[in-house]
């Protein structure tokens, strides 16, 4: 195939899609150029599904190569290692709008790999990767109901910005990524500085409108490339098997969905499934029905039963009304030795959240393609298998945990103090101890309380809520505070976090087409009411940050010195600063601009270290009298330490008004003496006098 190129303007950027020259053995391969940021995105689909495959094995890997930024990786091996948090998050970002566009029965393995090969530090690779994945899948001839487009939206001075640069995002009140088809929005990911629901919805519609250009270009590319449509055909439904299954189930599932407790309901449904499949086993053997097909159709009956019940009765499977939030319990200060902690329970979802305060050196150093930087606010989310009553793998965080942690972090980011306002590294850990839907939003609520319990001066409390949707034709219901089953069997997962003032984070994943602006508007308004209710419940535990830090949290004292004085504080080979930290038991961080941060659990020790540093960095004043210690005896005089790291010379003629034949007759090393500064010359040498002090005191005594 000859090389095909498509170029278009997208916001301020020139975007080029190329295919037919590189990675020609892949099912679909596209070079995406976003100005100087260049990605190779490939898509390969297996020719057939594996025997017994009962799920869709889609894998998305986004990777940033260090050579893209002209850098060599750090570490011993000097090559890229496992995926970074950023790479994992962008991999999920690509997966989420693509997965629902494959047919339900398609089980062939599909792999998408997006490789950043050249990076302009001001242009991130996320939107280019989404566009490339859409184009590569469209070229691969898979049964992909795309293409999709993607756009990043910023907001400043009341105006939306299409695909803002990294620099522009620093001043933007919003960073929102939206992806979708020509007719529908499928995915939204955002963080905002407490914006209104109207502004957030406007950003989604703005991004969806602008991305139509991308969709049109990808369609043109596939036509020019001569891509053949997929010949995959969905397996025919076995109507006889489905009818027999429905007859055997009867109204048992409808009754099971009346059980309000999650675990009891799950046990009831499992028992029905076991009985029904057991009863149908003899006929299944005769008819040749596969056990996997029976189990799949039973799941479809579950899906239809729950949805039909909610749409017709407007009552949910746990008995709640559509807009009712589950009972909430919130407690702060639940762990005695931590710096801040909270227990947040909403129905059968529960999180223990802990805040730990550290110094600047506790920040995480990120070695990225665009350069090294330090992260001083860390948010970690853990989802152990016991939280859903199961056994399972336990260890390093999975992609889902990294994604949920990032969403929860986005929820509280807008209210966090700057490093200048609160010079601590802050780590928040959310331990999910029970889960039945919306554990990431429970993490937002719990982290808000834990931060306030730790004394972190956040601007306002934050709460989060997950919304759901059940839609059949024109009939739909929006659900507040969804359960796990409602998430699994519903058409939308719509998470909103924010304060009473506005939205701080919004994440939306839609499984069907046809979600209108009206539905999104209703979901946002219903979410606002739910969020305000949750904030009211949280207020029973804590409403403002505590004024005092925990007894176990480090106290930070900050002082500013002239950068030229830094070497005096450090001393030769680090001797001075090591002596201060050892004597006072403190931890001291010195920044290049002369900012010194002293950390200690003991406030008195921190103050002692501060006094030592102030003494070292203070200038010696001519004419002032100091008390010093004799450091060294010489034939011509004695060196006296008047301040830490500052020695001056008392010449033999300045030791006494009497004639001194031998310095050692008058002074010994270690003696404490009072000296007057006679002069500090241009080279910083200090001339001292003991005689001048004695003469001055003599004159004063005579006057009295």
Swiss-Prot record:
What EC numbers are recorded for this enzyme? 2.7.7.8
GO CC, one annotated term: cytosol
What UniProt keywords are attached to this protein's entry?
Cytoplasm, Magnesium, Metal-binding, Nucleotidyltransferase, RNA-binding, Transferase
The family database entries (Gene3D superfamilies) matched by this protein are listed as:
GHMP Kinase, N-terminal domain (3.30.230.70), K Homology domain, type 1 (3.30.1370.10), Nucleic acid-binding proteins (2.40.50.140)
Q: Does the keyword RNA-binding apply?
A: yes
Annotated catalysed reactions: RNA(n+1) + phosphate = RNA(n) + a ribonucleoside 5'-diphosphate
**Which top-level group of life is the source organism from?**
Bacteria
Residue pairs linked by disulfide bridges in the UniProt entry? none
Cofactor(s) the protein requires to work: Mg(2+)
Q: Where the protein is mainly located, per its record?
A: cytoplasm
Molecular functions (GO terms): 3'-5'-RNA exonuclease activity; magnesium ion binding; polyribonucleotide nucleotidyltransferase activity; RNA binding
Q: Which residues form the S1 motif domain?
A: 623-691
UniProt domain KH: residue ranges: 554-613
Q: Please cite one Gene Ontology biological process associated with this protein.
A: mRNA catabolic process
Give me the residues that bind Mg(2+), please: 487, 493
- Assembly and interactions? Component of the RNA degradosome, which is a multiprotein complex involved in RNA processing and mRNA degradation.
Q: Which family does it belong to?
A: Belongs to the polyribonucleotide nucleotidyltransferase family.
Could you tell me what this protein does? Answer: Involved in mRNA degradation. Catalyzes the phosphorolysis of single-stranded polyribonucleotides processively in the 3'- to 5'-direction.
Q: What protein is this chain from?
A: Polyribonucleotide nucleotidyltransferase
Species assigned in the record? Xanthomonas euvesicatoria pv. vesicatoria (strain 85-10)
């Amino acid at each position: 195939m000859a090389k095909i190129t498509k170029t278009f303007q997208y916001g301020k950027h020139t975007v080029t899609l190329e295919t037919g020259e590189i990675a020609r053995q892949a099912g679909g391969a596209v070079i995406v150029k976003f100005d100087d940021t260049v990605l190779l995105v490939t898509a390969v689909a297996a020719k057939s599904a594996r025997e017994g495959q009962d799920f869709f094995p889609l894998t998305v890997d986004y990777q940033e190569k260090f050579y893209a930024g002209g850098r060599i990786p750090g570490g011993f091996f000097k090559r890229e290692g496992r995926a970074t948090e950023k790479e994992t998050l962008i991999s999920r970002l690509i997966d989420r709008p693509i997965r629902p566009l494959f047919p339900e029965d398609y089980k062939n393995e599909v792999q998408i790999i997006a490789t950043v090969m050249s990076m302009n530090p001001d242009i991130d690779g996320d939107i280019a990767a989404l566009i490339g994945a859409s184009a590569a899948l469209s070229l691969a001839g898979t049964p992909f109901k795309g293409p999709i487009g993607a756009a990043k939206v910023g907001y400043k001075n009341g105006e939306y910005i299409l695909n803002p640069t990294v620099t522009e995002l620093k001043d933007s009140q919003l960073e929102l990524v939206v992806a979708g088809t020509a007719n529908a929005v499928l995915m939204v990911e955002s963080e905002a500085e407490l914006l209104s629901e109207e502004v957030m919805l406007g950003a989604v519609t703005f991004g969806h409108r602008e991305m139509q250009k991308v969709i049109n270009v990808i369609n043109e590319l596939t036509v020019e490339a001569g891509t053949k449509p997929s010949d995959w055909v969905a397996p025919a439904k076995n109507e006889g098997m489905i009818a027999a299954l429905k007859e055997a189930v009867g109204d048992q599932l409808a009754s099971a969905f009346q059980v309000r407790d999650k675990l009891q309901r799950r046990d009831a449904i499992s028992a029905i499934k076991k009985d029904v499949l057991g009863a149908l086993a003899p006929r299944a053997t005769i008819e040749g029905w596969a056990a996997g097909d029976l189990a799949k159709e039973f799941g479809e009956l579950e899906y239809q039963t729950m949805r039909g019940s909610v749409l017709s009765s407007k009552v949910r499977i746990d008995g709640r009304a559509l807009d009712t939030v589950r009972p909430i319990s919130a407690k702060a200060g639940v762990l005695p030795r931590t710096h801040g902690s909270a227990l947040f329970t909403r129905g059968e979802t529960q999180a223990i959240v802990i805040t730990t305060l550290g110094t600047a050196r506790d920040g995480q150093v990120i070695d990225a393609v665009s350069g090294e930087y330090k992260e001083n606010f860390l948010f970690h989310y853990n989802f152990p298998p016991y939280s859903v009553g199961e056994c399972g793998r336990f260890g390093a965080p999975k992609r889902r945990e990294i994604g949920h942690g990032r969403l929860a972090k986005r929820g509280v980011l807008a209210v966090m103090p700057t490093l200048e306002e609160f010079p601590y590294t802050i780590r928040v850990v959310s331990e999910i101890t029970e889960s039945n839907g919306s554990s990431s939003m429970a993490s937002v609520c719990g982290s808000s309380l834990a931060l306030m319990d730790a004394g972190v001066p956040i601007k306002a409390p934050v709460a989060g809520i997950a919304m759901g949707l059940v839609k059949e034709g024109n009939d739909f219901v929006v659900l507040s505070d969804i359960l796990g089953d409602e998430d699994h069997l519903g058409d939308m997962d719509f998470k909103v976090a924010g304060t009473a003032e506005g939205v701080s984070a919004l994440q939306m994943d839609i499984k069907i087409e046809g979600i209108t602006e009206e539905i999104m508007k209703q979901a946002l308004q219903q979410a606002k009411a739910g969020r305000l209710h949750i904030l009211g419940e949280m207020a029973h535990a804590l409403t403002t940050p505590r004024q005092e830090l925990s007894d176990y949290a480090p106290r930070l004292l900050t002082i500013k010195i002239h950068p030229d004085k830094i070497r005096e504080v450090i001393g030769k080979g680090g001797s001075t600063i090591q002596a201060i930290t050892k004597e006072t038991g403190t931890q001291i961080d010195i920044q290049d601009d002369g900012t010194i941060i002293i950390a200690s659990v003991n406030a008195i020790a921190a103050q002692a270290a501060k006094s030592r540093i102030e003494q070292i960095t203070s200038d010696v004043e001519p004419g002032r009298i100091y008390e010093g210690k004799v450091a060294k005896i010489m034939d011509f005089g004695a060196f006296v330490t008047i301040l830490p790291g500052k020695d001056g010379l008392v010449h033999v003629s300045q030791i006494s008004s009497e004639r001194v034949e031998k310095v050692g007759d008058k002074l010994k090393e270690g003696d404490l003496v009072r000296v007057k500064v006679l002069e500090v010359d241009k080279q910083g040498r200090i001339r001292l006098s003991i005689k001048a002090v004695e003469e001055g005191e003599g004159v004063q005594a005579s006057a009295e």
